Amino acid sequence: MREIGHFIGGKQVAGTSGRTSNVYNPATGEVQATVALASVEELRAAVENAKAAQPKWAATNPQRRARVFFKFVELLNKHMDELAEILSKEHGKTIEDAKGDVIRGLEVCEFVCGIPHLAKGEFTEGAGPAIDMYSIRQPVGIGAGITPFNFPGMIPMWMFAPAIACGNAFILKPSERDPSLPIRLAELMIEAGLPAGILNVINGDKGAVDAILTDPDIGAVSFVGSTPIARYVYGTAAMNGKRAQCFGGAKNHMIIMPDADLDQAVNALMGAGYGSAGERCMAISVAVPVGEETANRLVEKLTPKIESLRIGPYTDDKADMGPLVTKEAYTRVRGLIDRGIEEGAKLVVDGRDFKLQGYEDGYFVGGCLFDHVTPEMDIYKTEIFGPVLSVVRAQNYEEALSLPMKHEYGNGVAIYTRDGDAARDFASRINIGMIGINVPIPVPLAYHSFGGWKASSFGDLNQHGTDSIKFWTKTKTVTARWPSGIKSGAEFVMPTMK
């Protein structure tokens, strides 16, 4: 049985803790590997490697740091098929979806190729008599990232690319459910010219997370996962004096106005609701049609499309979606569907008993559609993280708008309409971080920042874009005056610009 270890000091190393976790093939339910779970001592080994390598890397000029990422982008493109297959084998998503996962991470690496410009400070000449003032950005030192299972390519690159480009060393703790791709990415970074010790990958469970959060040499932590764990990571990191950005759960709504192009909205809902089997923090899980006629037509058009979804293993290049990632995820999603029925929602399309011939033990759930869902129901409040779409009917625009505004989560939201006034009002008033206008999954591109509001985000700086440069650097402001500019002796009052 293959055992996946760690990546420390520029090479793969075997685990030494004696603790492991199984890595499953989601399509078959079979164990395909084990992954080592790091001890505190193994994390410290990674940190010591990072400490030794980081000062020289920070002193490397930004053009040379950028060249590593230019080469890394080239290698990602060269190895795209290999990377997608590694990802799909452990996660279960289709090959094309896996390529999209890697490509969105690649785009962040392209963005940080501009680090010579992005990390520039500010300068004020003549701030006072013969006084110049300037600010510089310097790396935090050692950063860490704790990433979820659902995007094992994109989200690690969200974190380590800007952190390393800014001159930091980095400790990555990926999900133990699909740990192979992050290690392969680390190997490619070394091939691209990154010095050993700058990027380390530690596999592990809560013990590894706690070791990261309490390690005195780690200065900043980035996290993506569920809201309860995001709160825990944020609070623990803060108590240990660390900068933290933590991103949690979501319940993303799409409002469909009566004037919307309904066919366009339906196609958007299919991709946004059922792509990646719904295991996306930006999946649309709630459709809010405005008016009974709009709702009836929407459900009528959605039903046959959901029933005809092609579901299969990653080796099926015609599959629309694959299995859920683990048996636990499968059981949880099935339980929430059952709960929705108990609460009185109408299950229009029931995919609970979907079985794929030859893959009967896989974690497949067919597409499901609930109608007549209300805000009091658990299936409305809870992030299901599966191929389940809930229809909540609204009688008018104001009622529709109030639904996502009152929800605990505030990650993403979308509106489909031909009315520019309604769209502008929506974008202005909604209390959610990422907004789509006739765009179903409003994930910002790499040069803008990604982040939600409310219980979807903890911390004041987002992922990628210019926020990422600010997060992974500290600002130092210098006020300089040379002797020829000193005209008077000691002063004992607060200096001001007279």
Walk through the language-model features, giving the residues of each.
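Hydrophobic face of amphipathic alpha-helices that form TPR/SEL1-like repeat modules
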Residues: M1-A27, R352
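A structural signal for short, well-ordered beta-strand elements
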Residues: N22, A36, A58, H91, ...
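Conserved C-terminal structural/oligomerization subdomain of aldehyde/semialdehyde dehydrogenase
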Residues: T28-T34, I218, I255, R310-P313, ...
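Residue-level signal for inorganic ion chemistry
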Residues: G29, R65, L87, C109, ...
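Glycine-rich loop-to-alpha-helix module at the N-terminal edge of alpha/beta enzyme cores
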Residues: Q32-A119, A130
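Structural signal for hydrophobic packing residues in well-ordered secondary-structure cores
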Residues: Q54, A58, V73-M80, A84, ...
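Rossmann-like NAD(P) dinucleotide-binding subdomain of oxidoreductase/dehydrogenase enzymes
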Residues: G121-N267, A394, G459
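ALDH superfamily catalytic-core signature
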Residues: P228-T374, I437, I486-S488, V493-K498
